[in-house]
Amino acid sequence: DNKKFVVQDANQFLKESGELFDLIVLDTYSSRHIIPLDLVTVEYFARVKARSAPDGAVVMNIVGSPSFSSPLSQKIDNTIRRVFPFPLGRQVIGSFDGWCRRGCPDRNLMYVWYNLPENSDVYTINKNSAFYD
């Protein structure tokens, strides 16, 4: 009952909507040569993040270099991580030669971010509660 599929300009929808969503799926890129420029910006990703409900998730499918050797892939990754620093997972979808550094074929890069309370605690030799966590 609470599923909603929206077909309209993503950026405009996020500007106008005040709704929060449990799951937001971004899959607007068909190749690295057809990327809507306004959908790879800090401003756009901040709008997406603002529409994620507590305990919600944002799933992003980006087309780029699996080794992040191209400037485009590096800058998109930097942009996403600027807005979604933690907890963010990244996975290459499809076959990938981990030894390829330059000229690798583009692949789908899946990012998943969870809207959880941030926790910046770390384990140190003097403060290690890993056994209890």
Q: PLM features: residue spans?
A:
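The AdoMet/dcAdoMet-binding core of the Class I SAM-like
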Residues: 1-77, 83
